[in-house]
């Protein structure tokens, strides 16, 4: 359900992200992201999930999720701008990522890579590394260890 409470989004059989209208139960209204727009490095992205930012102008997409523990996963994250119709990697230098999530105002995205926390400013595109001490099975910043997922 979108913020207006009237529209919803879903994947069409053709692989497009489409916006439908609940009031007349139709999904023919508008293609938000066409399947042909989801090409990265000459390969079709198979989207496993997506999330809109607060003003619903950007879509965070993830592909090729790989399980870490019971509930956690790492994936390749992308941002799609609905105004410019531009697709970009969340951060190609630090990929795959875990737990990518919008800030409450939708202007930044935080994510985990290599047990360190990063933040991407969506306006400037600048990625900032927040922690420097992440180490596999030793120091885990921003996420849980396997034992927490078992409890």
Report residues per predicted region.
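Beta-propeller folds
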Residues: 1-151
């Amino acid at each position: 359900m979108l913020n207006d409470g009237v529209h919803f989004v879903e994947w069409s059989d053709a692989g497009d992200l489409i916006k439908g209208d609940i009031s007349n139960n139709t999904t023919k209204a508008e293609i938000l992201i066409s399947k042909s727009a989801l090409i990265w490095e000459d390969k079709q992205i198979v989207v496993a999930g997506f999330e809109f930012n607060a003003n619903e102008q950007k879509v965070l997409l993830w592909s090729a999720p790989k399980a870490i523990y019971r509930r956690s996963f790492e994936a390749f994250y992308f941002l799609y701008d609905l105004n410019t119709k531009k697709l970009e990697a969340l951060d190609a230098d630090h990929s795959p990522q875990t737990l990518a999530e919008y800030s409450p105002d939708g202007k930044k995205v935080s994510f985990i890579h290599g047990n360190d926390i990063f933040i991407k400013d969506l306006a400037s595109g600048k990625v900032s590394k927040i922690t420097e001490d992440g180490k596999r099975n030793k120091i885990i910043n921003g996420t849980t260890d396997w034992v927490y997922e078992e409890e």
